[in-house]
UniProtKB/Swiss-Prot annotation:
Listed name of the protein: Phytanoyl-CoA dioxygenase domain-containing protein 1
Modified residues (Phosphothreonine): T55
Lineage, broadest ranks: Eukaryota, Metazoa, Chordata, Craniata, Vertebrata
Cofactor(s) needed: Fe cation
The species this protein was found in: Rattus norvegicus
Task of the protein: 2-oxoglutarate(2OG)-dependent dioxygenase that catalyzes the conversion of 2-oxoglutarate to succinate and CO(2) in an iron-dependent manner. However, does not couple 2OG turnover to the hydroxylation of acyl-coenzyme A derivatives, implying that it is not directly involved in phytanoyl coenzyme-A metabolism. Does not show detectable activity towards fatty acid CoA thioesters.
């Protein structure tokens, strides 16, 4: 049954995250992995667009936050790479398929496999059980968490980057297409941290001032002792409240930790911030989840 039980809904409301084991089958995960392998095999990224992805604030502003390749990726399928995988000329130092940090941000719109997963009847039933009336899909990503050097994701709130008024209207759905364990960089959460508001916002520069972003506010020094790990077996789905604090460590194991994730916004009575880096476009307005 895809709908949440009253006890599951209560736990999500209390913690700001919830694991649903076995939400997707192993076969569905294989289909996603096979399709992403095909997309990677066809990858052709010009030298000047080879952007290393980071969640560290200073590196964000120096790399993807100030490049049009990132800022214009909201309605496209684009590739972002781990740190240290290019030489000074932009050539790969490791096999290209092992260099990718993530693919974003519109797999849900442009690829039939990921569109089918995103809009699957069980996802729609799950989201309905959370009470969302007019959910729209704002972005999607396939995350690789490569073995041996898959980068850490520093503590953050999704609403820092996907801000709405009022708050509390963004929901992440994170699907483990491979086992996500302590050894290979599973997610960590601070339970209940979604009730304290947003401490930092990433703001896009006005269009007439050129591409770029800046941050308003600062990330608190989160107490590491407050984080709890959330290992997830392949096929598990994690619901993530837009304001819950979460992170993941670097993957130093021999195994990747692949996942498909997408974010929804409750469009009813909600204003999507015009300052967000990601904006709907004429080519791709935020598509409704319910079809």
């Amino acid at each position: 049954m895809a709908c949440l039980s009253p006890s599951q809904l209560k736990k999500f409301q209390e913690d700001g995250f919830l694991l649903l084991e076995g939400f997707f089958t192993a076969d569905e995960c294989v289909v996603m992995q096979q399709r992403i392998g095909e997309i990677v095999a066809e990858m052709d990224v010009p030298l000047h667009c080879r952007t290393e992805f980071s969640t560290q604030e200073d590196e964000q502003l120096q790399t993807q936050g100030n490049t049009d390749y990132f800022l214009s990726s909201g309605d496209k399928i684009r590739f972002f790479f781990e740190k240290g995988v290019f030489d000074e000329k932009g050539n790969f130092l490791v096999p290209p398929e092992k260099s990718i940090n993530k693919i974003g941000h519109a797999l849900h719109a442009h690829d039939p496999v990921f569109r089918s997963i995103t809009h699957s009847p069980k996802v729609q039933a799950l989201v309905r059980s959370l009470g969302l009336q007019i959910p729209v899909v704002v972005q999607s990503m396939y995350i690789f968490k490569q073995p041996h050097f898959g980068g850490e994701v520093s503590p953050h709130q999704d609403a820092t980057f996907l801000y709405t008024e009022p708050l509390g209207r963004v929901l992440g759905l994170w699907i483990a297409t491979e086992d996500a364990m302590l050894e290979n960089g599973c997610l960590w959460f601070i339970p209940g941290s979604h009730t304290s508001g947003v401490s930092r916002r990433m703001i896009r520069a006005p269009s007439d001032s050129g591409p770029g972003t800046s941050f308003l506010g600062s990330e608190p020094a989160w107490d590491n002792n407050l984080f709890v790990p959330l290992p997830v077996r392949r096929g598990g789905l994690v619901l993530i409240h837009g304001e819950v604090v979460h992170k993941s460590e670097q993957n130093l194991s021999d195994h990747s930790r692949q996942a498909y994730t997408f974010h929804l916004m409750e469009a009813a009575g909600t204003v999507w911030s015009p300052g967000n880096w990601l904006q709907p476009t004429t080519e791709l307005p935020f598509p409704p989840l319910y079809i």
